[in-house]
UniProtKB/Swiss-Prot annotation:
InterPro entries: FN3_dom, FN3_sf, Ig-like_dom, Ig-like_dom_sf, Ig-like_fold, Ig_I-set, Ig_sub, Ig_sub2. Pfam families: fn3, I-set, Ig_3. Disruption phenotype: Mice show defects in commissural axon guidance in spinal cord including an altered lateral and ventral funiculi projection. The phenotype resembles that of a SLIT1;SLIT2;SLIT3 triple mutant. Gene3D superfamilies: Immunoglobulins. The modification Phosphoserine is found at S1159. Belongs to the immunoglobulin superfamily. ROBO family. Residues 1194-1203, 1315-1325 have a biased composition (Pro residues). This is Roundabout homolog 2. It comes from Mus musculus. Residues 1036-1089, 1129-1159, 1190-1371, 1383-1470 are annotated as: Disordered. Receptor for SLIT2, and probably SLIT1, which are thought to act as molecular guidance cue in cellular migration, including axonal navigation at the ventral midline of the neural tube and projection of axons to different regions during neuronal development.
Amino acid sequence: MNPLMFTLLLLFGFLCIQIDGSRLRQEDFPPRIVEHPSDVIVSKGEPTTLNCKAEGRPTPTIEWYKDGERVETDKDDPRSHRMLLPSGSLFFLRIVHGRRSKPDEGSYVCVARNYLGEAVSRNASLEVALLRDDFRQNPTDVVVAAGEPAILECQPPRGHPEPTIYWKKDKVRIDDKEERISIRGGKLMISNTRKSDAGMYTCVGTNMVGERDSDPAELTVFERPTFLRRPINQVVLEEEAVEFRCQVQGDPQPTVRWKKDDADLPRGRYDIKDDYTLRIKKAMSTDEGTYVCIAENRVGKVEASATLTVRVRPVAPPQFVVRPRDQIVAQGRTVTFPCETKGNPQPAVFWQKEGSQNLLFPNQPQQPNSRCSVSPTGDLTITNIQRSDAGYYICQALTVAGSILAKAQLEVTDVLTDRPPPIILQGPINQTLAVDGTALLKCKATGEPLPVISWLKEGFTFLGRDPRATIQDQGTLQIKNLRISDTGTYTCVATSSSGETSWSAVLDVTESGATISKNYDMNDLPGPPSKPQVTDVSKNSVTLSWQPGTPGVLPASAYIIEAFSQSVSNSWQTVANHVKTTLYTVRGLRPNTIYLFMVRAINPQGLSDPSPMSDPVRTQDISPPAQGVDHRQVQKELGDVVVRLHNPVVLTPTTVQVTWTVDRQPQFIQGYRVMYRQTSGLQASTVWQNLDAKVPTERSAVLVNLKKGVTYEIKVRPYFNEFQGMDSESKTVRTTEEAPSAPPQSVTVLTVGSHNSTSISVSWDPPPADHQNGIIQEYKIWCLGNETRFHINKTVDAAIRSVVIGGLFPGIQYRVEVAASTSAGVGVKSEPQPIIIGGRNEVVITENNNSITEQITDVVKQPAFIAGIGGACWVILMGFSIWLYWRRKKRKGLSNYAVTFQRGDGGLMSNGSRPGLLNAGDPNYPWLADSWPATSLPVNNSNSGPNEIGNFGRGDVLPPVPGQGDKTATMLSDGAIYSSIDFTTKTTYNSSSQITQATPYATTQILHSNSIHELAVDLPDPQWKSSVQQKTDLMGFGYSLPDQNKGNNGGKGGKKKKTKNSSKAQKNNGSTWANVPLPPPPVQPLPGTELGHYAAEQENGYDSDSWCPPLPVQTYLHQGMEDELEEDEDRVPTPPVRGVASSPAISFGQQSTATLTPSPREEMQPMLQAHLDELTRAYQFDIAKQTWHIQSNTPPPQPPAPPLGYVSGALISDLETDVPDEDADDEEEPLEIPRPLRALDQTPGSSMDNLDSSVTGKAFSSSQRQRPTSPFSTDSNTSAAQNQSQRPRPTKKHKGGRMDPQPVLPHRREGMPDDLPPPPDPPPGQGLRQQIGLSQHSGNVENSTERKGSSLERQQAANLEDTKSSLDCPAKTVLEWQRQTQDWINSTERQEETRKAPHKQGVGSEESLVPYSKPSFPSPGGHSSSGTSSSKGSTGPRKADVLRGSHQRNANDLLDIGYVGSNSQGQFTE
């Protein structure tokens, strides 16, 4: 850019800036305060804000000043409690204020500044609010009268701002809007106070700091006395009574007093009642005047006056105010006869006894020997009444105007008869209590003599039977641990010789009641009323009056009146309830009857004690209406009548005839009253019942409806209307007894003792009293069983109410019955109580009304019945299981024998042109089974001779061996098998000391027969049992060959025993091994078979005739049918858990369950039958020379038996379903042998015959190579043993008592001489020579392990080719077969020489196991008796098994056989 242009641009910009700056400054203006701060009063410690807002341009800054000094804010000091807000306001976090330091209180201004100037706000003061605690003046209590004003003063505490005042009454704020209430300057003024204004008043001072309450002050509002009833002026006659009433009210209750003419009343002239009524009994002229009633309390006083005027009346004759009345008093008592009179002038009163001249005057001094006195009011009192005092007493009143008199009779009675029955002072009350609580039922009684307290429940005695119920002091009943059954009505009975009194209450026991009885305080109850006074008497009523007693917590609300009359009842009776007044007339009484009365008061807390008894009072009598007779005369004549009662006569148990005579028949007799009462029994009573004989001339009466067996007291009394004469003497009579008409009640049956007890307890209550019909003397108890021999009877005394019956039989149903017995006989029996003592001796009580169905149900529920049914079901189930097992075993035994029949032309009947197979569907052979069960080979731990080689049939029994005893061989086979024996590898070869047993290896059954032409099909034998024995002393050797020597390896602790068997040839079986036909030639030699195994050494003491039963033609199935049948690979056995013994059905040493099936090539060669016959004749000829010797230094342990139904046998579905065949091209794929797996729990013998070539043989012991496997190999580590994980088999126990331990280390085993010979080899070819060479090589197996291993690998492919080439040979001549057999025998002899070398005894230390290979189950289309068919996975083993059926190979043959495993299951690598 040009420098000139740049300079110009700079100048231009500078000018623009100057111009713009001048314009901005022109718009600025100085600050001005927009919002000024306001005065504020704030409490100490509270936050507040002084607002200040200013505007200006530029924006002004704001500062605050207090009292002229700048205020320090958080801008200056971050710790300051003052904050300058962005708006300019000053914010105080808290107001700081103290007595000495007041930094925040003062006058504040806000100053806003900018460059143009400053602005100052108005002053704002900040004051700190205060309120002290102490009131300057607290209100004081005030007492006012209602209607007067009340003033309460208060001065609040000091504070800033000055606190205001309001008032609270009873903690509620007073509304001063009410007209009567005003608050002025701290004064509360209430005009015209009311009673409702009374209460506690509090003065409250408040400001912004808070509130302060003064001390409370009480305002008491009293009421002045007021008159409810004022006295009134009265005018009365002289001698009349006068009353002035004065009723007042007030608060507090005013006191009332009377004055007369401003002076006190004269004493003795007036009475003042409780209601302040003034009463003057007899007014006199001197009583005239003004009477003033004065009522006064603390807030007032009132007066009311009335005037009394007394007028003198004229002279009046005397009159009775209160007349004396008749009285009946017992001897020794005191009696008073009232007599009140009036008249003008006042009459003089005196008393006189009728017939006596003595006069008794009021205020007369009492004579020393006199018991009579007269009160000033005219009442006569006689103390210590005697019988001589009886009679009439006359009260006379005498004046100048005349005289009057009144009579009253005094009757004196016997002391005992006069005494009233006992009085219950406090009786029980109704209660509701909880279960397990305690009940207290009070009953306090008094009387003369002192009564006895007893208790009844529902009318029956119960004390003594239940220890929970006891009577405490003063008769209180206590019941502990209450139960629901304790609910009922309880009656307290107070009894004495004078009678009895009862009181009842209800006790209700519930789950939710009170725990214990409530004890009432006697002070809460009202006091007893005063003694009732008789004010009026009529013929059927008496008027009583009394005074209330001392009130309790609450005054009495009502009264109860009780009465007693000896002629009516023997106990107190309630005659009036809920009486509200103290004056009451009792009505409904009998005429001319003496009564006693007493009164009780009631309030909500209960009943009071009774009042004192009233004086006896007799109701008025009734005069005959028309006769107008003199009562005195009637009473006198009746008193002279003497009635003589004769002895009553019992007519029936309920009727008695009463007769009497009268000495003189008086004029005034209307009839005779026969009186009787019960004196015995539970309900004995003192109440007399009456039967009136209304004909005066009648002298007899019949009492009916009497109780049976009860004693009655009878007397007769004459009567005339209401007048009654003297009673006759009493007579007693007892009605006749009868048997009780009702059974005992509440019969219960309980168990006694422990659960093993056979005793029961029976308890009961007596029959109802009305049905006892006499005195119960005893109770009879029957315990009746279902048979007479189980009956148990008992008899107990009448006082006993329970009994224990023992010796009952469990399971027997008893019926318990109880009956009461009197002298007349046994009464009604109770309802039977069925009981059963169960298995645990439990007593089962069934209701009598149960139906038969319910009773059956109860029996079915018994444990004994259930246990019996369960046991029976178990026995039936076990029987059925045994039968089913036997039947199944029998059917399997019949179905497992694969037998062929020889044709007439010497040929073989076959199924579908297949050699060795029968047509299962042929109707000519219905006994053949539909399917072949699973193969389970016998497992044994002993050695047996060759004479028992044929006993592998399912039902054949092994013949006994010398020294063996009763030991039976293990037989677990469910299918047919082949057998091959390897003798050259056994240590007992050429030895006559032991006998070997052949080992089965294939699936076609070899039948035991005594004749070459005999077909032996034996049923299963029960002695064919499992005897699996394992030895721990052989380095964990898993499986062994069958052993029949009882003592062999039978020791404990790993010790071995040798059993010496007789060297003499066994003669048990007449058939010889030479007679056993060989199977048809296999396609491929079996690995591990040597031709030398068939070399016979008869010179060593073996008798060939005792060997194995010959068969006409051996049934045999060829292998190599991969292209015809396919294996069902969905059925795969689960690999076993290591350390668990594998199934001998598959894993038995030198055995194989691989199915041998014919190949299509064999079916196409009809010459095979001829070859088979020729080979059989040659084989039998050569085998006759063999001698079997068994030596076994280390017999291997016996493996556990397999689970029943293992997959080695054919399933039914397998035999009924055809599966398409699968191509077997991968059979020829090379195998790689992996490195061995060490330290396995079990390494049983291989499925191959020669254990030297198996994983337990010598061939792999040094090189530690892993043996190949097949899905259907008997190798326990690859297929069969792994199945034990599904069904582990428990450890077997030897007969010696030792448990078989599970082997824990790998082991190996030599080939044993009891191995069965394999089938003959097919026609010779390249493969045959090669295999014989391998056989020769096996003699040096221990010194050339590496070379053997490599030989096996080299020969795999060659063996496959050899197998194919052997299948391509359609026909062989007889000479070729014979030459092959001769080579085979020579090789066997060479093998035996090699075995005798010292190194033959060497045994490797460990063994290997290949990983688990998925096996394949046989195709359903298979026809093998073992239940399997050929597949890819079983080709190798099946070919090896075929070689066993043709000839034995040398041990080296195994190493060079190319195919020993299944390529379809995986490759093996080294």
